[in-house]
Amino acid sequence: MTDSDESSWIHWFCKQRGNEFFCEVDEEYIQDKFNLNFLDSNVKNYKCALEVILDLNPGSASEDPAEPELEASAEKLYGLIHARFILTNRGIELMLDKYNKGEFGTCPRAFCHSQPVLPIGLSDNPGEDMVRIYCPKCNDVYIPKASRHSNLDGAFFGTGFPHMFFMEKPDARPKRAKQKFVPRLYGFKIHPTAYRTAAEIQKDVTMTPVGEIDSPSHI
């Protein structure tokens, strides 16, 4: 990586605390207008935001939006570009490196034995849901452990990323977890109907009128 790469907005953004799930999108990818089709309708100040991402001179400062507003637009635009980029071969390679290093975290399920996870969105529309983590071992999704990731929009990773990832990198996919938790009481397995039966008994006791409850016999 060159000094110019390290001083770029993209590098700076990805190094911010809470942005560890992002990879650095190649500038060549962003410069190809075909890759940005229809994103202008989703981002305010689209042109200025794109110039921020690419470290271009935005022109007259008097015409620019207020800095916090522009920065928010740049971050949103980068996130939407990122969701597309990580479906490409180059993007998958970068995310594979992070996956192998465990940078996305591990599955909280005990029987998955700290299986590395991938980020996933529950919606492709920005603003609808936050990022989740997907475990390929138990095939389930969870809320990220670190609270700093709770503000990441799930649309910046997309609903299809893990599935494309493992289609391109099948060797990285672990075997599905077979071990399941079995509830026991005093060492015996609890029958699936036990809780329902107990609830029905409790309900019957609760609904029985006081006068109908048998009183103890007297000699």
From Swiss-Prot:
Pfam families to which the protein is assigned, alphabetical: CK_II_beta
GO biological process: Wnt signaling pathway
Entry's Gene Ontology molecular function annotations: protein kinase regulator activity
UniProt cross-references to Gene3D superfamilies, sorted A to Z: 2.20.25.20, protein kinase ck2 holoenzyme, chain C, domain 1 (1.10.1820.10)
PANTHER family the UniProt entry points to: CASEIN KINASE II SUBUNIT BETA (PTHR11740:SF0)
Family of the protein in this entry: Belongs to the casein kinase 2 subunit beta family.
Lineage: Eukaryota, Metazoa, Ecdysozoa, Arthropoda, Hexapoda
One cellular-component annotation, GO: cytoplasm
Processing and modification events after translation: Phosphorylated by alpha subunit.
Record's function text: Participates in Wnt signaling. Plays a complex role in regulating the basal catalytic activity of the alpha subunit.
Keyword Nucleotidyltransferase: no
Sites of Phosphothreonine modification: 2
Assembly information from the UniProt record: Tetramer of two alpha and two beta' subunits.
Record InterPro entries: Casein_kin_II_reg-sub_N (IPR016149), Casein_kinase_II_beta-like (IPR035991), Casein_kinase_II_reg-sub (IPR000704)
Protein's name in the database: Casein kinase II subunit beta'
Xref: SUPFAM superfamilies: Casein kinase II beta subunit
Entry annotated with the keyword Nucleotide-binding: no
Transmembrane spans: none
SMART domains tied to this protein: CK_II_beta
Keywords, sorted A to Z: Phosphoprotein, Wnt signaling pathway
